[in-house]
């Protein structure tokens, strides 16, 4: 509901749905994420959304994944046990090393010339995660630093993943 509130405050027309016909009308589908990768993928399968999201990505219709939603965009995750993901962005999700949780504010270092992301340089964003993306460099748009460097924004075409929570990051989000 934080994402919905944030988007409505910015005057976006927001609909929450798992109906493919409703999602197809959307300019952008946002995959939020709180919870565990295996149960989230099970929910997507149970709601018959996996095939739809894969097809939407093939057609280059925008999808934004936030936190766990970003992780679901990948080929799979080692959270609890290996679970296959949507496979929209090559790479996997692995546990953070010590410390095992990253909760707090960090800046983004951009690796690509993305104008929207470039506007976010030197601003802090809110993170709350215990897993990170591990994959080819060409899909890493921004990195952040917490003991070690990790990807904080990934993307392939019109599929974008944000490890941070823009809706909890105040004005920069």
Regions found by a protein language model. Name each.
Residues 132-173:
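C-terminal and late-domain segments of enzyme folds
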Residues 67, 71-73:
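Glycine-rich nucleophile elbow surrounding the catalytic serine of serine-hydrolase chemistry
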Residues 1-62, 68, 92-94, 172:
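N-terminal beta1-alpha1 cap of cysteine-dependent amidohydrolase-like domains
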Residues 75-148:
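Pocket-forming structural segment of enzyme catalytic cores
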Residues 33-34, 68, 130, 164-166:
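Glycine-rich His-Gly loop
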């Amino acid at each position: 509901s934080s994402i919905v509130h944030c988007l409505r405050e910015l005057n976006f027309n927001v609909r929450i749905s798992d109906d493919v016909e409703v999602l197809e009308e959307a300019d952008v589908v946002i995959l939020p994420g709180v919870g565990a990768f295996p149960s989230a993928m099970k929910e997507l399968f149970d709601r018959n959304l996996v095939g739809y999201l894969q097809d939407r990505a093939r057609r280059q219709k925008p999808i934004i994944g936030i936190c766990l939603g970003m992780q679901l965009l990948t080929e799979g995750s080692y959270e609890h046990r290996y679970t296959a993901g949507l496979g929209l962005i090559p790479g996997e999700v692995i546990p953070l090393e010590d410390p095992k949780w990253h909760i707090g504010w960090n800046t983004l270092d951009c690796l690509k010339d993305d104008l929207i992301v470039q506007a976010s340089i030197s601003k802090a964003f809110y993170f709350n995660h215990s897993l990170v993306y591990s994959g080819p460099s060409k899909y890493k748009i921004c990195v952040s630093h917490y003991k070690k460097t990790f990807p904080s924004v990934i993307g392939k075409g019109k599929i974008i993943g944000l490890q941070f929570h823009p809706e909890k990051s105040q004005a920069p989000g």
